[in-house]
A protein has these predicted regions:
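Conserved AMP-binding/adenylation subdomain of ANL enzymes
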Residues: 210-227, 235-291
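AMP-binding/adenylate-forming catalytic core of the ANL superfamily
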Residues: 409, 415, 437-527, 552
């Protein structure tokens, strides 16, 4: 990596904060216009050479623009026009971001699809979106799926390699390129994780997706030594959000194409990040077994976005790395002047957000000095206009009462593509319902207990799965590497909670149910009716973004308690 900085001067970053035309559709152009270090590499891809050594390749802002323009010429030559949705089914890494840039520069709407999605689900999703074309790393299975129903086939179904090999000199870009977006223009479609069924298609708008991120221009660590490893799926709003931030900052960033520890740790050792951004899936692996001491030696901050991570994993990660003197407080927290001295260990910034929220709208920071506070996601960020806990009728409930988490903020999605009815179902009393169950304490801190679809309906009342998982992961850590708690039918009526666990290497499940229930009783939580060990990957199913598919666990174990129960007289 170059010794010359790629980071935009503070004055440039401050101007971004007040630019009324800046948004998700033109942030690359704004960055290349304003950053005097536009020729210095900042975005890094990675690969292994023939000796198994990590090779990092840097791309400057100018490099990204050149690649974008070449890809845009291919799309334009293939008939893509403003407002048309195009499917992008490309493996994680920098490549899907280049296609995002190319399509938005034409005013088209990239429908970014995680290539791990099942192909039958993918075809249903792309057909619902109404894409005019699809670019994919491998079109074989998609083509086969479309042959079963030719009416669904889009105008083109092309290989990524075809776009990469295109001779851009043979095609012209359209007049008025790059496209000038209006604030409300849709610039991307992001699918949900599919944990509840067919993925929803969340719209990201030009200005909406930038709202709330302005404070990052001055409150995201961007010292000369700072480097970010981005493990977010870059076909997801989280990955796009972080890359928008680092592009505008000019912050050196390695865009990972693989989230597994076996791939991540060697790149950490080569890149030496000071920050790591990920969904919980990678944090679980990094916190398991021997810690990645060498790769995380310089890490001062871990950023999690999505469903909040678990304390049992967080407490191990924050023992790694070091915090430099004056480390700024993240944008998710109330603004305060940083005065702390250099400290050992790191901070874990746990943000509760979603594609629909546009970013993490709640934030909690855990460091080695922080006391345990299970399921706390902190207070709303400054972009949030209102945050509340509502009952089913949309009435705000008192502090300490569990209800539906609701937010009002300019970062909230315009809605779901081609599904106004679904969009309206998430709007209530001027709020957006996040799909989460939570409560607020008297100090204004929010506690995230479950997704609404995962609440366990017992005869004694609702049981929330996430607090139970916290206990298993933190207090049964010698045996439990990861777990998921779901509700299944009980012969006496209602549901009871069961746990599906992945054991630590070499650990046994002997006595685990009894030990877990003893710890749950100490915490005042419901006990588990049963426990099952997931020995194989298919027994602990994950969605395209790495989230556990609880619906599949509920189906798999639906008869567990009925089969185990004695026959009724």
């Amino acid at each position: 990596m170059s010794d010359q900085t790629s980071i935009a001067p503070l004055a440039v970053r401050e101007r971004f904060m007040s630019d009324p035309t800046l948004g998700a559709g033109n942030f690359l152009d704004r960055a290349v216009e304003a950053n005097p270090h536009r020729a210095v590499p900042f975005a890094f891809s990675h690969r292994l050479d023939h000796r198994g050594q990590v090779v990092l390749r840097g791309h400057s802002l100018l490099d990204l623009v050149a690649l974008r323009d070449r890809y845009a010429a291919w799309y334009h030559a293939n008939g893509v026009r403003p407002g048309e949705p195009v499917g992008v089914v490309i493996a994680e890494g920098l490549e899907p971001l280049l296609h995002f840039f190319a399509l938005t520069a034409l005013g088209a709407v990239p429908a970014l699809v995680n290539d791990a999605m099942r192909h039958d689900v993918m075809v249903r999703y792309l057909s619902h979106v109404g894409v005019v074309g699809v670019v994919a790393d491998d079109t074989t299975r998609l083509a086969s799926a479309y042959r079963k129903d030719p009416q669904l086939r889009p105008r083109f179904l092309s290989l990524t390699a075809e776009v990469q090999a295109f001779d851009a000199a043979s095609a012209a870009l359209p007049e008025g390129y790059p496209y000038q977006h209006a604030a409300e223009d849709v610039v991307a479609l992001i699918h949900s994780s599919g944990t509840t069924g067919t993925p929803k298609s969340t719209m990201l708008a030009h200005r909406q997706f930038w709202e709330g991120k302005q404070p990052r221009m001055v409150r995201f660590p961007a010292e000369s030594y700072d480097r970010l490893m981005s493990l977010m799926p870059h076909t997801h709003a989280g990955g796009l959000s972080y890359f928008m931030t680092t592009t505008l900052l000019g912050l050196p960033t390695v865009v990972m194409s693989d989230w597994r520890r076996v791939a991540v740790e060697p790149v950490m050792e080569a890149f030496r990040p000071t920050m790591v951004a990920s969904f919980p899936r990678t944090f679980v692996e990094l916190a398991t077994g021997e810690l990645p001491t060498a790769g995380a030696a310089m890490v001062h901050s871990w950023f999690n976005t999505g469903d909040s991570a678990h304390y049992g994993h967080i407490r191990r990660l924050v023992q790694l790395g070091e915090r430099p003197a004056g480390l700024i407080r993240p944008w998710l927290l109330p603004q305060e002047r940083a005065e702390q001295a250099a400290l050992p260990g790191s901070q874990f910034v746990d943000g509760l957000g979603s594609s629909e929220m546009g970013m993490a709208l709640f934030g909690q920071v855990t460091s080695p000095e922080t006391e345990r506070d299970d399921r706390c996601v902190g207070t709303p960020s400054e972009v949030v206009e209102r945050a509340a806990v509502l009952d089913e009728d949309g009435v705000e409930v008192p502090d300490g009462t569990v209800g539906l988490l609701a937010v009002a903020a300019p970062s909230i999605t315009p809605g779901y593509w081609n599904n106004e009815r679904l969009t309206q179902s998430f709007r209530q009393a001027g709020y957006w319902l996040t799909g989460d169950v939570a409560y607020r304490d008297a100090e204004g801190r929010f506690y995230h207990l479950d997704r609404t679809v995962d609440v366990i309906d017992t005869l004694d009342g609702p049981v929330y799965s996430l607090p139970l998982e916290e206990v298993l992961l933190a207090d049964c850590a010698a045996q439990v590497q990861d777990c998921s708690v779901v509700g299944v039918p009980h012969p006496d009526g209602g549901q009871r909670p069961i746990a599906v666990v992945r054991l630590q290497d070499g650990a046994s499940a002997d006595g685990l149910l009894e030990a877990a229930n003893a710890e749950l009783a100490k915490a005042g939580l419901a006990e588990l009716a049963a426990l099952r060990v997931a020995d194989r990957a298919e027994e602990f199913p994950l969605g395209p973004t790495g989230k556990v598919l609880k619906r599949e666990l509920r189906t798999r174990h639906a008869g567990l308690l009925s089969a185990a129960a004695p026959a009724r007289p």
